[in-house]
Swiss-Prot record:
It holds the Pfam family Cu-oxidase. This is Laccase. It catalyses: 4 hydroquinone + O2 = 4 benzosemiquinone + 2 H2O; 2 (4Z,15Z)-bilirubin IXalpha + O2 = 2 biliverdin IXalpha + 2 H2O. It comes from Bacillus subtilis (strain 168). Residues 45-81, 101-178, 240-318, 378-509 form the Plastocyanin-like domain. The gene is cotA. SUPFAM superfamilies: Cupredoxins.
């Protein structure tokens, strides 16, 4: 089915309004609901799941240090409309688990562990059933962190890929009042772009595969797939939308909320992006980019200056295929900018060179160095299973950093693909990447480097919480753990990998407790 591109205006998600607000705290309520939305002018309405019945969910905008509480409520149907594989992470408990489980993770949030959205802290409709790690109905987000682009999404055990694909995603923006001095584009010129990919049937329904291609007769049905990319790209819940802009500077907060797909974004007129931030907030200094790679869960904070493009139409393009080349008719396109609106007032916003101060990584303060490898195996059905350090989810915890300590994690990737690795609770700095001989490593376990360590490009010199670990490279990151202790996770953010079984619990310990 061919859908005409750039016929629907880009929706700007509503900002969530608090139920109660005082100097001490702000309280929100959000309900997960089944809903229908018309994703394209020529499509029938699509059944989705959305926060407050919206896809994407409402944007939550908070100030740095604002004490925020959110009651996340599940009002979803008792059965899923996407294919559940009951052979992965099935419950060993005596009580039957509900088919539809949810829990919300604030991605990039520095939050207590009982508000982090631990996969086994799930809850069913009206909290009738809860997972073994469920602790509270109202989550607490202290927002004691830098201004940054965060996002919230489902994180339920073995269901994350399906619940997110169904629509359970939304943006969460922390505003730092100190940013005002930088005079960045603001208000209606500060726009979130939440990018997803889907396959949509002619009747408007979402397609998600119930089995891998050419499945063997022995496979369970439904059966998890190792990856999935839809050929139809949506931004803020619309298929290939357009945005009318003024000939001036705009700030775009770009979030990759896709399950598997990595994008390589550029402007089709050869124009530049000015990157001002990444996952964890502003960069030390702005970076001029002609293109940038955005893996699942990564965020880029960019400025596009349309001043010289009055009257033009510009396509935000993608050159990264998913298991093959991009199709110029489909996934090579993201959205269109139309520089057709008159300038409302003089543009006094800036593209500052220097943005934020950064402490250098103090190598003498490193308390621990961990070597962790990405690995692959097969399950009893012959399906691929990707692992972290050859451990399954339910194996004993092996990563136990102490609160306040700084560690270097050396992540070895001998697999065939790039994996976006996400650590909960912390932001980290990228130290370097170094190529190694995969064949020798697979054969003998010997790490034989084939080139020098390469420091991160300027676009990765800020705070990160999700980072691309490329095939055939050792990635080194430095993280200071805390300020909270408790049970968190780290995982690959390709959701099909995360669900089976590329996710591990992580205990951040406090020796004083």
């Amino acid at each position: 089915m061919t859908l005409e591109k750039f016929v629907d205006a880009l929706p700007i998600p509503d900002t969530l309004k608090p139920v109660q607000q005082s100097k001490e705290k702000t309280y929100y309520e959000v309900t997960m609901e089944e809903c229908t939305h018309q994703l394209h002018r020529d499509l029938p309405p699509t059944r989705l799941w959305g926060y407050n019945g919206l896809f994407p969910g409402p944007t939550i905008e908070v100030k740095r240090n604002e004490n925020v509480y959110v009651k996340w409520m599940n009002n979803l149907p008792s059965t899923h409309f996407l294919p559940i594989d009951h052979t992965i992470h099935h419950s060993d408990s005596q009580h039957e688990e509900p088919e539809v489980k949810t829990v919300v993770h604030l991605h990039g949030g520095v939050t207590p562990d009982d508000s982090d959205g631990y996969p086994e802290a799930w809850f069913s409709k009206d909290f009738e059933q809860t997972g073994p790690y469920f602790k509270r109905e109202v989550y607490h987000y202290p927002n004691q962190q830098r201004g940054a682009i965060l996002w919230y999404h489902d994180h339920a055990m073995a269901l994350t890929r399906l619940n997110v694909y169904a629509g359970l995603v939304g943006a969460y923006i922390i505003h730092d009042p100190k940013e005002k001095r930088l005079k960045l584009p603001s208000d209606e010129y500060d726009v979130p772009l939440l990018i997803t990919d889907r396959t949509i049937n002619e009747d408007g329904s979402l397609f998600y595969p119930s089995a891998p291609e050419n499945p063997s007769p022995s496979l369970p049905n439904p059966s998890i797939v190792p990856a999935f990319c839809g050929e139809t790209i949506l931004v803020n819940g619309k298929v290939w939308p357009y945005l009318e802009v003024e000939p001036r500077k705009y700030r775009f907060r770009v979030i990759n909320a896709s399950n598997t797909r990595t994008y390589n974004l550029s402007l089709d007129n050869g124009g530049d992006f000015i990157q001002i931030g990444s996952d964890g907030g502003l960069l030390p200094r702005s970076v001029k980019l002609n293109s940038f790679s955005l893996a699942p869960a990564e965020r880029y904070d960019i400025i596009i200056d349309f001043t010289a493009y009055e009257g033009e139409s510009i396509i935000l393009a993608n050159s990264a295929g998913c298991g093959g080349d991009v199709n110029p008719e489909t996934d090579a396109n993201i959205m269109q900018f139309r520089v057709t609106k008159p300038l409302a007032q003089k543009d006094e916003s800036r593209k500052p060179k220097y943005l934020a101060s950064y402490p250098s990584v103090q190598h003498e303060r490193i308390q621990n160095i961990r070597t962790l490898k990405l690995a692959g195996t097969q399950d009893e059905y012959g399906r691929p299973v990707l692992l972290l350090n050859n451990k399954r989810w339910h194996d004993p915890v092996t990563e136990t950093p102490k609160v306040g300590t700084t560690e270097i994690w050396s992540i070895i990737n001998p697999t065939r693909g790039t994996h976006p690795i996400h650590l909960h609770l912390v932001s980290f700095r990228v130290l370097d990447r170094r190529p190694f001989d995969i064949a020798r490593y697979q054969e003998s376990g010997e790490l034989s480097y084939t080139g020098p360590a390469v420091p991160p490009p300027p676009s990765e010199k800020g705070w990160k919480d999700t980072i691309q670990a490329h095939a055939g490279e050792v990635l080194r990151i430095a993280a200071t753990f805390g300020p909270y202790s408790g049970r968190y996770v780290w995982h690959c953010h390709i959701l099909e990998h995360e669900d089976y079984d590329m996710m591990r619990p992580m205990d951040i310990t406090d020796p004083h407790k």
